[in-house]
From Swiss-Prot:
GO terms for molecular function: ATP binding; ATP phosphoribosyltransferase activity. Pathway: Amino-acid biosynthesis; L-histidine biosynthesis; L-histidine from 5-phospho-alpha-D-ribose 1-diphosphate: step 1/9. Lacks the C-terminal regulatory region which is replaced by HisZ. It is found in: Cytoplasm. Belongs to the ATP phosphoribosyltransferase family. Short subfamily. It comes from Prochlorococcus marinus (strain MIT 9313). The gene is hisG. PANTHER family: ATP PHOSPHORIBOSYLTRANSFERASE, ATP PHOSPHORIBOSYLTRANSFERASE ATP-PRTASE. PROSITE patterns: ATP_P_PHORIBOSYLTR. This is ATP phosphoribosyltransferase.
Length: 217
């Protein structure tokens, strides 16, 4: 049986739609009354695991799921040994450095050495500032990192930005982009090598789907 790790939250609806187009119907996970965390597909040849976003690559890396869908930001942060198979094109956002709009900083390199930077993504932040050769103290927060500069716990933040509205509403502005992120189909490397064709059919169906021209909004 094929096991697929799906992230709860913003990526779930589009993830289910992509697998449905590839022949696996996990629409039962979208039922408001569903409380199951392991849900079989309608065809009975696959099942979905409903997990936290950051746990998707963990389940795939350890082989408990052969496939999964997760944001590129999570892959960059956790560095798990999984195969990145298809950029699915939804869940688009960017990882960025943001500061108070009144701070006067224009670029990340303008930040003072050894200042505090708050983030949920401390690995990504460390890589970025190390590449700038700018020593900073990273403060790991698990939610509402926008409060960092507002309370004075940090001079800047590194966080995901979609529309930028949350930053603007809190008097912050993005000054530098680390990378773009979107949802990715990932796989367990050994499972893919031992695959008798079932996994490859799903991967190819999704790859073909992403190569088709998109209808204009």
């Amino acid at each position: 049986m094929i096991t697929v790790a799906l992230a709860k939250g913003a990526l779930l609806n589009d993830s289910v739609a992509r697998f449905q187009s590839a022949g696996l119907d996990f629409s039962a996970v979208l039922d408001p009354g569903n409380r199951q965390l392991m849900v079989p597909s309608h065809c009975g040849r696959a099942r979905a695991l409903l997990v936290r976003n950051g746990d998707v690559p963990v389940y795939v890396a350890y082989g408990q799921a052969q496939l999964g869908v997760v944001g590129y930001d999570v892959l960059r942060e956790h560095q798990m040994p999984v195969a990145q198979l298809v950029d699915l094109g939804f869940g688009g956002c960017r990882m960025a450095v943001a500061v108070k709009a009144s701070s006067g900083y224009q670029h990340a390199a303008d930040l003072p050495p050894h200042c505090r930077v708050a983030s949920k993504f401390t690995h990504c932040a460390r890589e970025f500032f190390d590449a700038l050769d700018l020593p900073v103290e990273l403060v790991h927060l698990t939610g509402s990192v926008e409060l960092g500069p507002l309370t004075g716990i940090a001079e800047a933040i590194v966080d995901l930005v979609a529309t930028g509205r949350t930053l603007r509403d809190n008097g912050l502005v993005a000054i530098e982009e680390l990378f773009q992120s979107s949802a990715r189909l990932i796989g367990h490397p050994l499972a893919l090598r031992l695959d008798r064709g079932d996994l490859q059919l799903i991967v190819e169906a999704m790859r073909i789907q992403e190569s088709l021209p998109k209808n204009p909004a």
